[in-house]
Amino acid sequence: MIRTFIARQSFALWGLGLILGSIPCFSQSVEVESGTLDGGAGIQNCESCSGQQMVGNLGTGSVIVPVQVTNAGTYRMTLSYATGDQRTINVTPNQQAFVPITCPASGGWSTVATIDLRVTLQAGNNLISFDNPYGYGPNVDKFELSPLPTPLVQIIPFGINSRIEYDLANGTYDVYFTNTKVVAEASARAHSNAVYRSNAGYTSRTYTSAPVTDRFGTGTRHVITLSGGSQLEMQQVFYTYPSRDEFYTEVLLNGPGSNCYQMSPLTSNAVDIQSNADHRALFVPFDNDKWVRYEAKEHRYANFTSSEVGTLYDNTSRKGLIVGSVEHEVWKTGINLAGEGRTQTSYVSVLAGWTNENVTRDKRGHGWVSVGQQSCRSPRILVNYANDWRQGLEVYGQANAIAEPRYVFNWTQATPMGWNSWGAIQSDLNLTKAKQVVDFFANEVPVFRNADQTLYVDLDSYWDNLTPGGMTGDFSQLTEFANYCKSKGLKPGIYWAPFVDWGKFNRTMEGSSYNYQDCWTKVNGQPLDLDGAYALDPTHPGTKARIAYLINKFKASGFEMIKIDFLAHASLEADSFYEPGVYTGMQAYKVGMEYLIDQLDGSMLVYAAISPNIATGRYVHMRRIACDAYKGISETAYTLNSTTYGWWQNQMYSFIDADHVVFANESEGENRARLASALVTGTLITGDDYASDGVWKTRSQELLQNSDLLQIINDGKAFRPVEGNTGWDPNALFVKSMGNSHYVAVFNYGAEAKSFTIDLARVGLNAQQANQMKDLFSGSNLPSNTTAGSITLNVPAADVRLIQLRESALPVTLVNVEAKKVNRTTRLNWKTTAEVNNREFIIERSLDAKAFKPIGTVAGAGSSTKSIAYQFTDTTPTLNQTNYYRLKQVDLDQTFAYSKTLAVRFADQDSLTLFPNPTHGPLTVKVPRTLVGELRLEITKNDGTPVLVKKYTSVADRSIQINVAPLNVGVYTLSLEDTEGNRRQARLIRN
């Protein structure tokens, strides 16, 4: 009761000696150069150091410093050091266990900084050594020792048997997950005009708590308020929720002048994940630009800052700690991870207010936050220790979606699939080629459709080849393209980079009276050039007017999807921003992206290319996990590096995408691997030049019409990596479950064939469960040996195996199911290699691949172990359309299963095409090649009443143009008949 009472009151560190125990009020300062040097360590001059000297070369060398204290106990050591880059020093008192201390860069080799640690000393003489036999150490100036005040611990429970132990006497905290200490001696700090640290300078620390209900649920908000010592008030805040195993923390600085450029709610030199068989630290990039890669570094070599989230894990046990920001509207956040020079513990420091030109692309430091306000708050940080680091990262992804809900409208339609012109056509794009691509998808690959029975056909950069006069020119060709897509049942897409200026010269900005130079983002007064383009200030009214102008053009043209690119340009730190109150790149990003989404007004699927990995989750439906990959196995490996370590982003985005899937002239194996990389990531955007002939067309007709493969992405979710110890290379093995089916993808990125033995338990499957196995590329069933606990797959060089495992074997093993057009009939052939209680096959047909109806039955063989061939002929397929077929296999007990869906098109020469359709004016009628001679065109109402009749003795280019504006709004039938009585019909919608 006494401790609880004290913990909830404001107490003065030096005024509670009777309650807290005796606290000697003294400290001593010791110059390190007074010690004994060894192994090449040497004294160096340093004007900013005390005594103008320091000790260097402490990687290969060491220094031993004698210290005398009156009482045995734990002491706070404040170490003064200088280093140009982050380095670790080992502090060893009296040849005991060394204390590794990672020292962040101090600002240069002659600039001194300080860091605190704890050492245990004996009464009387002590010898403290400083060295780093595992790497390079910082230069050391001096250290100060003061007895550590008696701890006063406030316990903050969370999760199951987890707690934070906050030491009110010393301003640090330990974190226990399921009664295991993982984080020790963590502190908070804030960088304003001075540096404020939770563990130094404050004389009073108070604990309070109150219920809280926010987006994460109902829980408790725990607040440690630090004051005194002539410092600005600091508050350390912890959020806990009964239903969550993680906790969240933030730090605030309060009072006049509390604005900050960097804040850290958690910095610890003593993180121990308690599992070290294959200890890894994960680097997560800020964006997907410049072919950046994720990297799972070995812990002993880790010394880097990861973007927004940092993960320390053991790949063998899979236990791991995840620390990351879940708020991105104000701060860029880095998670500094260091294991270099350590054997077990790690250094972890959250850095809200972090920039790095090679990672965040910034060319200046982070902007100040809360300028002119009375309080400055860091982002909220998730801290989670998971039994499986992969699950922990998925929880982190979900937490981001909770903390910052989508600004873009929720996507309820099917997983997007389609084509993008940048894959192969690129700068050669024109209207003719764009239409030829549409025709290829409409006529040659009718099964390649998403669950909504459509595809997106997206014009990328160089769409302005179709707008003579540029952005202010003639958009009629784009409108024609969009209408042509829709006439074929497809959806048109467009591309734009809204926050860049490729011209880089001053001129009037489209849609406004501003000049481009007024809108350029500037650093040190100069335009900021990234990726060959000047960044535009996303808060400037000229940038906004340009966005509104062009988005309205796209909407008027009829586009239903937009791919937006080079978004990281909008997040760059700048000298200043146009909009008042905006001081950081992420604040500017929020302004620009919200304005862009407002202009789109729910009219399009929004798809991001180069963009911030995590902060973009609010604004788009779909995002590329990597960028600018095309066809070969090396590019498949590059995209799958991002999927291996970034798959969890599908918790924030409706879909993540593996970039262009281009088959080109690569080997069949590389084509399969490229396609599989998209399926593993969760969507499929192709990119070949389907306006010209080549082997890629044949490959596409085969690979893109394999319904077993296409069904994998129905849920739009990525596969999980099995291992996380591949450095900056991709994993070879991925797994995903859908219902009672499990999919295993095994990639061979090498130049030689390779055999893979897959431990089913390691993959996450029931090793004792009998499974039916099917190779989805070949369609063949494989011998099942899964009850042995593993399967072995041989994968050719630069290839992939994609296997489906079903938890219960099907009673009938189907192979070689095919359907082909024979004159004006459809012939279906299939075989079985085994049958158990097979009653019959019901043949079903559909015109939309959704609503199927039975058209015939073939009796089954009951039970058989022999190969049996079956055949059925559909003598009345619907002509001028695509007919879809499937087999419904029915057992004697009435249970059933479906085959894959097959498509047979009867419209190659016979279809009647109308576009645009719907229309309220001009209409083009494409005349089928089977209609000859004089033609009679008739438009009738639904009751058969003619409303328009015309005759044509000849037509140019097999096209007829008419104007349907005089017709009333409604649905009509348009018929075209030749002199021989051949007749074709199509539905016409007048809007």
Predicted features and spans:
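Extracytoplasmic
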Residues: 28-152, 792, 805
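Carbohydrate-binding surface patches
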Residues: 67, 75, 80-81, 247, ...
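C-terminal beta-strand-rich structural cap/linker in extracellular carbohydrate-active enzymes
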Residues: 128, 785-809, 970
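Carbohydrate-recognition beta-sandwich/jelly-roll modules
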Residues: 155-451, 561
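Glycan-recognition surfaces
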Residues: 509-541, 545, 587, 591-695
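Short, compositionally biased serine/threonine- and acidic-rich segments at solvent-exposed termini, linkers
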Residues: 807-910, 932
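Short, surface-exposed loop/turn motifs with a glycine/proline- and acidic-biased composition
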Residues: 859-884, 953-980
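C-terminal tail/sorting-segment detector
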Residues: 892-908, 949, 969-991
